Amino acid sequence: MSRIATTFANLAKQNEKALVTFITAGDPDLETTEKLILELEKSGADLIELGVPFSDPMADGPTIQLSSERALCAGTTLPKILTLVKSVRQQTEIPLILMGYYNPVFLYGIERFVADAVSAGVDGVLLVDLPPEEAEEFKAAADREGLDVIFLLTPTSDEARIRKVANLGSGFIYYVSVTGVTGARTSVADTVFPDVKKIREHVTLPLVVGFGISDPVQAGRVAAVADGVVVGSALVKLFEEFRGDELRERLGGFVAALKAGVKAVGG
């Protein structure tokens, strides 16, 4: 059983939901990212998504776009991120998911990327611009190496798309709660709750909800109906204001509060 599957199974046994946290790898630098991964885990994160910075992040709002720019300016590359994962994997067993765009993976070479990612200790990959209809080659390579491939569903996904993602994906399914780009929002769309119910009729994989969740109350509301919640932009926003120990402490405190919000709802 993969680290991702094991984590969700263990949480289910404890009647808990998953807190999935997102930060951009290399913002402000890769050395800091390694320390923050350990801080996120210590503070209550159950899974961690590492954003792979890209020069044309079409699905991302301004907060994560700026974070990607800072990481790219610091010299962050996909090979360096894999080296980071290999280093941090010696210190933790928390599931690590690379989230980004297909172009850097394609340029790296699909077979080579998958092999190197698994060797480094990556558990899953989510490529936001690789739809299931075009993912056959990547999915086949990932399946051979035991790498989970995570796909997105959105409020506009019809029943056929839901079935396709349910059949093709592994690890978990990521439901994007709003149309548009990433970014913290002041409330959770009411449509999330019936949408999640509809998706659950067709999927057996864990279902996590992200995009726009920005505080413990929102996280708790969504966790009440999903298997997990993803918080990204609200965390990445802290990187604009803080550095060093203060960034680590602020990030840790916020994640602890988010986890408390998620745990408050139970299973």
UniProtKB/Swiss-Prot annotation:
Q: Which Pfam families match?
A: Trp_syntA
What EC number(s) are associated with this protein in UniProt?
4.2.1.20
* Swiss-Prot/TrEMBL keywords: Amino-acid biosynthesis, Aromatic amino acid biosynthesis, Lyase, Tryptophan biosynthesis
Lyase as UniProt keyword: yes
Catalytic activity from the UniProt record:
(1S,2R)-1-C-(indol-3-yl)glycerol 3-phosphate + L-serine = D-glyceraldehyde 3-phosphate + L-tryptophan + H2O
The record's GO molecular-function terms, alphabetically, read: tryptophan synthase activity
The positions flagged as active site in the entry are 49, 60
Please name the pathway. Answer: Amino-acid biosynthesis; L-tryptophan biosynthesis; L-tryptophan from chorismate: step 5/5
One CC-aspect GO term? cytosol
Assembly and partners are described as:
Tetramer of two alpha and two beta chains.
* NCBIfam families from the UniProt entry: trpA
Record family assignment: Belongs to the TrpA family.
- Functional summary from the UniProt entry: The alpha subunit is responsible for the aldol cleavage of indoleglycerol phosphate to indole and glyceraldehyde 3-phosphate.
Put simply, this protein is called Tryptophan synthase alpha chain
Which organism is this protein's natural source? Geotalea uraniireducens (strain Rf4)
